[in-house]
Structures are given as C-alpha cells and as structure tokens.
Amino acid sequence: MGVVRSLLLFVVAAVTEIGGAWLVWQGVREHRGPVWVGLGIGFLAAYGFVATLQPDAHFGRILAAYGGVFVAGSLLWGVAVDGFRPDRYDLAGAAICLLGVAVIMYARRV
C-alpha cells in the first residue's frame, strides 16, 4: 500500500504543480488575466503541502524523485492540454527520469 499511496501522491503533486504553473502561464503569457494567475498560485501552494504527505521522511529524496515525475508529467500535460507532440528524445528522457524515480524512491535499502 505504501508504494501505491506514494505513486498517487506523485500524481496529485504533478497535477497541482504543473497545473498551477500552466495557469500562471495562461494568465501572463496568454493574457487571460489575474484570476488565472491567482488560481495558479493557489495550485502551486497546494503542491507544497502534497509533498509533505509522502511516506518517506527525507525531503531531498522526495523532491529529487518528484523532479522525474515532473519531467514526464509536463510532457503528458503538454500532450493533453496544449497539443504538444513529444519526439522520441522527449519520450526517452522521460523514461530515464521515471527509472530514476523508481530507483530513488522504491529501491530496497539495507
């Protein structure tokens, strides 16, 4: 159950951080206005709390692993929301990052 919970928290973290950054981007770069920016800031703040719910006690480990989730999640967000089409190098890089996440978070430690 610990791994499943951890993975779900990574997904929630990705949605809150990437979604928040996207909302700020839309508000500023796409001139959608301050409401979008404010919503984005709220989502980004929520992301900060989600990370604290991870079962591992080490901040550095969690944030390092989340970096890999962020890479893959950002590409997925781009596909789903902005019509981005990743090339094979994007996909290979994301796969390498996710492998790193698995090693950092779920390798058996002695």
UniProtKB/Swiss-Prot annotation:
A single Gene Ontology CC term: plasma membrane
Cell wall biogenesis/degradation found in the keyword field: no
Coiled coil: none
Record keywords: Cell membrane, Membrane, Transmembrane, Transmembrane helix
Major localisation: membrane
Subcellular location: Cell membrane
PANTHER family to which the protein is assigned, alphabetical: UPF0060 MEMBRANE PROTEIN YNFA
The protein's name: UPF0060 membrane protein Francci3_2786
Organism in which the protein naturally occurs: Frankia casuarinae (strain DSM 45818 / CECT 9043 / HFP020203 / CcI3)
